[in-house]
Amino acid sequence: MAIILNEMLKKSFITALLLLIFSVLRAQDGTSAFQFLKLPFSAHASALGGENISIIEDDLTMAVQNPALLSCVADKTLNLNYMLYMDGVNVGGAAFARTAGERSTWAITAQYVDYGELKETTEENIETGTFSAKDISISGIYTYDLSDYWSGGVRTNFIYSHYDKYSSFAIGVDLGLNYYHQESDFSASLVARNLGGQLKAFEERHEKLPVDVQLGFSKRLSHAPFRLSLTLHDLTHWSASTTAANNFGKKLLNHIALGIDFLPTNNFYLAAGYNFRRGEDMKINGSSHWAGFTCGTGIQLKRLKLGM
């Protein structure tokens, strides 16, 4: 009886997620607020081209990328992270996870972005003073193992932004699905991020959240210490780019992030990646695409895990 119920639950979750994603793909257009939600919470994901939803490891930050990956996280895991994103912009966060029975895991997370003191100017570029700006998000994550191969997760995110005298509050939901075949070490994930909307707008006009549908794959090679990853991201905005991409091939590349891990042991990794969208958008005056490259490393020492 339990097997039948689990199979029905798995099929219902997958069907509901696919229907929701298809409806989102048809409805999305225009700009959105809360762009800080696109920042990677995970140092490992940042190193793999800035986008990854499919690597399987005991890393709580990956559950923010894909809530279904929370099933890989050990009980009573605590995570603290900090990143100097740009000059004067500080990004930090914390997360804690607990298992709940054999198939369920829950977690709470918090993230902030502090932009420091910004100059306030008139339309004539005359400086009139300074103001502060910050973004904050607090979320809860729940994941359930639908079977030995499938897991599904949901993340509810409470979002607050304050810029000078303007503020806004929103609620977003992330839905994630992961398939993992342990014998072949192959993982595939589907995620719909930032579904929801503003409850309080900055001014009179309500803005959308930066909805992002992603599809990702990771595969560890059988006879070599490497894991390859491919992530298709921002599928809700097929033509989105600051540069013109008129053919299908260029548009497709602008939605691809590639990553590779070197895994000599279970406690250490070297990671590198390339984000085609970032490389295309950040090149200046015909310069190279090196801006799309990323890299990082991580090490686990007993109960402490470090990533950068």
Regions found by a protein language model. Give the residues of each.
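Positively charged n-region of N-terminal signal peptides that target proteins for export
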Residues: 1-11, 148
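Generic secretory/membrane-interface signal
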Residues: 1-5, 23, 60, 188
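Extreme N-terminus of proteins, especially the signal/transit-peptide cleavage junction
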Residues: 7, 26-28
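Sec-dependent signal peptide recognition
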Residues: 10-18
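Hydrophobic h-region of N-terminal signal peptides that target proteins for export
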Residues: 18-26
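Subset of outer-membrane beta-barrel
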Residues: 28-308
